[in-house]
Regions:
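A helix-coil-helix interface module used to build multimeric assemblies
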Residues: 1-158
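A short, hydrophobic C-terminal helix/tail in secreted or cell-surface proteins
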Residues: 159-165
Length: 165
């Protein structure tokens, strides 16, 4: 099993690791597409400041698109011994492109990656919820139109009193 980035030279007790890490790897699968999008933006910036060549950028973007497609289809997996989604993406890139794949983390901390992934994931979820609420709103409006002539007989468990002010 590969050594985790945070282990350094100390072996962590497996019970403590299970308690603190829990289902992180499982939950990271939800972040895979967002991690890839963040990496695409980051490497575009790296190329713009001269840390990647145009050719390296093209190769990385092509492979990141493949990884994104894999995540879209639900086929993206974090292999046993791989710490998290960020490490898995880098591993996939280095397997396919060699040392070019290692360059995606230049000038970016893991905390930056985690924060961006969570923000993108949250934004996507909020958008989906807003769309569902809008659909519900339209259903309720249609129902209210359909039943507008039926008088209300009870409100809050009490007989309804119609007022004509």
């Amino acid at each position: 099993m590969a050594q985790k980035l945070w282990e350094k030279s100390v072996q962590v007790n497996k019970d403590i690791e299970r308690f603190t890490v829990g289902r992180d790897r499982e939950m990271d699968l939800y972040l895979a597409k967002h991690d890839v999008i963040g990496s695409m933006a980051h490497i575009t910036m790296l190329e713009s400041i001269g840390l990647l060549t145009k050719e390296e950028l093209v190769q990385l973007l092509a492979e990141l698109r493949n990884i994104y497609a894999s995540a879209e289809k639900g086929e993206f997996v974090i292999e046993e011994g791989v710490e998290d989604v960020h490490s898995q993406v880098e591993l996939m890139l280095t397997r396919r492109l060699g040392d070019i794949g290692k360059k995606i983390h230049s000038g970016r901390s893991r905390n930056d990656q985690v924060l961006l992934d969570l923000k993108l994931f949250t934004r996507t979820q909020i958008k989906e919820i807003a769309e569902a609420v809008e659909q519900l709103f339209h259903v309720l409006v249609n129902q209210s139109e359909r039943y507008k002539d039926i008088p209300v007989s009870y409100t809050h468990l009490r007989a309804h009193e119609t007022r004509h002010d």
